[in-house]
């Protein structure tokens, strides 16, 4: 690829170093860096590293737009990625530019990262990387919002027992629990999700939970969400399933023919 083509090419991740920041934010090989703070990025690998380091020195977050399997998503990062890159070819570059032209642009101050936790049957739980004041003011309400019903029941029973023993003991326990829930709410939700058999799958930046789920659905058409406005995806029939259906229909035809002969 000549220098002119390279200057109009995107950076594609060729490999991700172990324990790198890119590994932490769940980037994958063949992901393409499309835009830097909503501006198409053609400046090359060295410029990307320098710009990310400069942003970190200024304690500023960076909004990267990533292309994965021809789908775009945003990601907020704070630091250099730690990847090796190659350049996209002219055909891929043009296709991504056309896709980006149709993308809705959000100011990065409006966005937060959302962690997508997935189990083996594509059931997703989406956790916002931001603090919710309700966790510090009224923990049971926060637990109910995140559908942690068993924990809410346990918390309520313990609170009732404490208040029946001594009001001041209850008050001290409530304050300590509220502070802990507020400061460690993301870690708590991630831990609950891991205990339920889910694992980290994806991180996307979005302005709200609904749009985060839509973005995840685009990247993983099989994704299912509990208590969501999105309907569960229709079951995908594979080629083997098609053959099974055809064989079943053929057997039914043979059975009907045999019955008719009898």
Question: Where are the predicted features?
Answer:
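Membrane-cytosol interface at the C-terminal ends of transmembrane alpha helices
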Residues: 131-159, 172-196
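PDZ/PDZ-like groove recognition
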Residues: 5-18, 22-23
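PDZ-domain C-terminal substructure recognizer with occasional recognition of PDZ-binding tails
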Residues: 1-6, 47-93
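Hydrophobic beta-strand residues in large extracellular and virion-surface proteins
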Residues: 13, 27, 33, 64-66
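Conserved PDZ fold ligand-binding element
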Residues: 22-45, 203-204, 208
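Short, surface-exposed alpha-helical recognition segments that flank or form part
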Residues: 127-129
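Transmembrane helix recognition focused on a "late"/terminal membrane span
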Residues: 2, 17, 28, 90-119, ...
């Amino acid at each position: 690829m000549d220098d002119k083509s390279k200057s109009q090419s995107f950076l594609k991740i060729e490999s991700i170093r172990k324990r790198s920041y890119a590994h932490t934010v769940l980037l994958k090989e063949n992901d393409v860096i499309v835009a830097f703070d909503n501006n198409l990025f053609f400046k090359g690998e060295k410029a990307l590293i320098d710009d990310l380091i400069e942003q970190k020195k200024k304690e500023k977050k960076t909004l990267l737009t990533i292309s994965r399997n021809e789908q775009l998503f945003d990601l907020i990062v704070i630091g250099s990625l730690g990847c090796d890159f190659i350049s996209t070819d002219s055909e891929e570059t043009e296709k991504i530019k056309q896709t980006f032209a149709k993308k809705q642009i959000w100011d990065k101050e409006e966005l937060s990262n959302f962690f997508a936790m997935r189990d083996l049957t594509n059931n997703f739980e989406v956790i916002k990387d931001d603090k919710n004041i309700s966790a510090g003011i009224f923990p049971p309400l926060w637990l109910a919002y995140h559908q942690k019903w068993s924990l809410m029941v346990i918390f309520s029973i313990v609170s009732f027992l404490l208040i029946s023993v001594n009001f001041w003991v209850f008050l001290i326990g409530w304050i300590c629990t509220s502070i802990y829930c507020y400061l460690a709410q993301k870690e708590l939700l991630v831990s609950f999700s891991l205990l339920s058999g889910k694992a980290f799958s994806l991180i996307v930046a979005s302005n709200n939970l609904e749009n985060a789920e839509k973005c995840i659905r685009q990247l993983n058409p099989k994704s299912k969400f509990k208590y969501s406005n999105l309907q569960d995806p229709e079951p995908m029939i594979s080629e083997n399933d098609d053959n099974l259906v055809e064989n079943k229909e053929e057997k039914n035809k043979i059975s009907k023919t045999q019955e008719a002969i009898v």
